Amino acid sequence: MVFEIWHLDFQNMVSFSSKKLAEKIGVAETLRNARVARQFTLEAAARTLGVAKKYLEAIEDGNYNLLPGELYTKNFIRNYADFVKLNAQEVVGAYLKERKNCETK
């Protein structure tokens, strides 16, 4: 399974892996899995990032429409990816690709 491989290799993950994972399992699940693997609670992540817990929950659930706007969403995702030690640029890129795919369906 992708998650098992990712989980085992998390400490040594390279940017290629984070991009591949974000595209395979989705940005929401990638961020959640990374947070859990680093043993942070959602509350701790929200407190550290200075972002309301409800917004991080929305990101982890893929409910981007509950966020205050596209600019905020990209910044929240970028900061969250940095926080969990993923390549932020690639995670944001995967998010934009997800959104584009949703809009064309």
Model-derived segments and spans:
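Short acidic alpha-helix initiation/capping motifs at coil-to-helix transition points
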Residues: R35-V36, G69-N75
